């Protein structure tokens, strides 16, 4: 009788739903901002949050806050919370953290980017194409920052 070798359990991953959780578009300088030469300084802030809904089911929310200024005047402020519900099984610790803070936001980003672009265009501004984001690098930076802070507290 051949011995059965224990095989690691296969990771389970499914996208249950992708949806817009919250949208905000503000154009405080209108209509005067439309008279100015369009040479904006655009910035984007990114935030991710996750919460466990039930066993192996998580909501991940990616928040993109995009601002454009012409000189000192705010042209627009656009905030999009793109969310998803994901089934994730057979991951623990840092692998689960990586999945929820890098892999899932990477799935959500194209949806959020399209929503931001659409809102900016509806505000009658030129189309805004946000550059891709390396969520793996952002996750690694957050891990290193946390380790550094813990080391400072323990010394």
Swiss-Prot record:
GO terms for molecular function: unfolded protein binding. Disulfide bonds: none annotated. It is found in: Cytoplasm. GO terms for cellular component: cytoplasm. Keywords: Chaperone, Cytoplasm, Protein transport, Translocation, Transport. GO terms for biological process: protein folding; protein tetramerization; protein transport. The keyword Repeat does not apply. The keyword Acyltransferase does not apply. Belongs to the SecB family. This is Protein-export protein SecB. The gene is secB.
């Amino acid at each position: 009788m051949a011995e059965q070798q224990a095989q690691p359990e296969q990771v389970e991953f499914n996208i249950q739903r992708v949806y817009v959780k919250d949208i905000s578009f503000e154009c405080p300088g209108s209509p005067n901002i439309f008279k100015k030469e369009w040479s904006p300084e655009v910035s984007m802030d990114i935030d991710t949050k996750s919460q466990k809904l039930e066993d192996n089911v998580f909501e991940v929310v990616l928040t993109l806050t995009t601002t454009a200024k012409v000189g000192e005047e705010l042209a627009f402020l656009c905030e999009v919370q793109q969310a998803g519900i994901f089934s994730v099984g057979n991951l623990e610790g840092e692998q689960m953290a990586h999945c929820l803070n890098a892999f899932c936001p990477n799935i959500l980003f194209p949806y959020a980017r399209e929503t931001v672009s659409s809102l900016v265009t509806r505000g009658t501004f030129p189309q805004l194409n946000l550059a891709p984001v390396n969520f793996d690098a952002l996750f690694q930076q957050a891990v290193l920052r946390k380790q550094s802070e813990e080391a400072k507290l323990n010394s």
